[in-house]
């Protein structure tokens, strides 16, 4: 005969949930953990992929990734005809300029700040069969010296062109050629131009840009700055003396 508990015992034991309700509650908890994990993983993936693209935009002067058109690549290759020596693409993006140059026989290097694009470029070079002559490196263009390159390609933006113009003029040899795409340099006069609109390409030969003055060097620039500073100091002293004489 089944024993029936007293009212006091039933109150202490509390309500007894059916087995089906306990199972549903456990399933809901499992689904909650699963959804949280999926959402968290997705957000982490988006962050990891997007950060290399967003970070350059936070810099004072950024070089955004805009893929070169097939016509732009064709125009760059045209400007490289009868040229020799190593080539560098400043801000190489997905590597199409470097790969095209390597196919033309140039030892080509691309510098890019976005690691995803660098890895993708290396894969594309391997697929194209030019991974031996097309190299890609993760680096900020302002931290790289370009003195060893005879051919320089840049897809720039207006804000960076004046500063880059000065950097290249200091570092490149007289025989080097700079090929600018989308935007020309502000002070240099192009020796060759091809294409129209967004596909326009400007070529600058360093020997022509410098004229008969030859290649400037860091020592000359330093002396020039010192001379300018000394001149300003002398002018300031002379002005001060005149003011004292008046008094």
Curated annotation (Swiss-Prot):
Disulfide bonds: none annotated. It is an enzyme of class 2 (transferase). The modification N-acetylmethionine is found at residue 1. One of its GO terms (biological process) is peptidyl-lysine trimethylation. It catalyses: L-lysyl-[protein] + 3 S-adenosyl-L-methionine = N(6),N(6),N(6)-trimethyl-L-lysyl-[protein] + 3 S-adenosyl-L-homocysteine + 3 H(+). The keyword Metal-binding does not apply. Keywords: Acetylation, Membrane, Methyltransferase, Mitochondrion, S-adenosyl-L-methionine, Transferase, Transmembrane, Transmembrane helix. The chain crosses the membrane at residues 34-54. It is a single-pass membrane protein. It is found in: Mitochondrion membrane. Its EC number is 2.1.1.-. GO terms for cellular component: mitochondrial crista; mitochondrion. One of its GO terms (molecular function) is protein-lysine N-methyltransferase activity. Residues 1-12 have a biased composition (Basic and acidic residues). Residues 224-238 have a biased composition (Polar residues). Gene3D superfamilies: Vaccinia Virus protein VP39. Residues 51-85 are annotated as: Required for mitochondrial location. Residues 1-25, 209-247 are annotated as: Disordered. Signal peptide: none annotated. Induction: Expression is up-regulated in dorsal root ganglia (DRG) during chronic inflammatory pain. Mitochondrial protein-lysine N-methyltransferase that trimethylates ATP synthase subunit C, ATP5MC1 and ATP5MC2. Trimethylation is required for proper incorporation of the C subunit into the ATP synthase complex and mitochondrial respiration. Promotes chronic pain. Involved in persistent inflammatory and neuropathic pain: methyltransferase activity in the mitochondria of sensory neurons promotes chronic pain via a pathway that depends on the production of reactive oxygen species (ROS) and on the engagement of spinal cord microglia. Contains an atypical, non-cleavable mitochondrial targeting sequence responsible for its localization to mitochondria. This is ATP synthase subunit C lysine N-methyltransferase. It comes from Mus musculus. The gene is Atpsckmt.
């Amino acid at each position: 005969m089944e024993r029936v508990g007293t009212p006091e015992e039933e109150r202490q034991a509390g309500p007894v949930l059916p087995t089906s309700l306990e199972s549903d509650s456990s399933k809901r908890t499992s689904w909650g953990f699963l959804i949280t994990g999926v959402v968290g993983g997705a957000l982490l993936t988006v962050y990891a992929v997007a950060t290399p693209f967003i970070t350059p935009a936070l810099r004072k002067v950024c070089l955004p990734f805009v893929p070169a058109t097939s016509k732009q690549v064709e125009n760059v290759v045209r400007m490289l005809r009868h040229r020799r020596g190593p080539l560098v693409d400043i801000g190489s993006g997905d590597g199409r300029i470097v790969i095209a140059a390597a196919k033309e026989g140039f030892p080509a290097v691309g510098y890019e700040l976005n690691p995803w694009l660098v890895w993708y470029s290396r894969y594309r070079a391997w697929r194209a069969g030019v991974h031996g002559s097309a190299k890609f490196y993760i680096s900020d263009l302002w931290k790289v010296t370009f003195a060893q390159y005879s051919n320089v390609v840049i897809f720039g933006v207006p804000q960076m062109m004046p500063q880059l113009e000065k950097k290249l003029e200091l570092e490149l040899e007289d025989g080097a050629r700079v090929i600018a795409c989308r935007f020309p340099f502000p002070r240099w006069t192009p020796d060759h131009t091809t294409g129209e609109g967004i596909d326009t390409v400007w070529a600058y030969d360093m020997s022509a840009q410098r004229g008969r003055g030859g290649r400037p060097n860091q020592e000359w620039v330093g002396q020039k700055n010192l001379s300018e500073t000394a001149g300003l100091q002398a002018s300031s002293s002379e002005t001060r003396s005149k003011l004292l004489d008046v008094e």
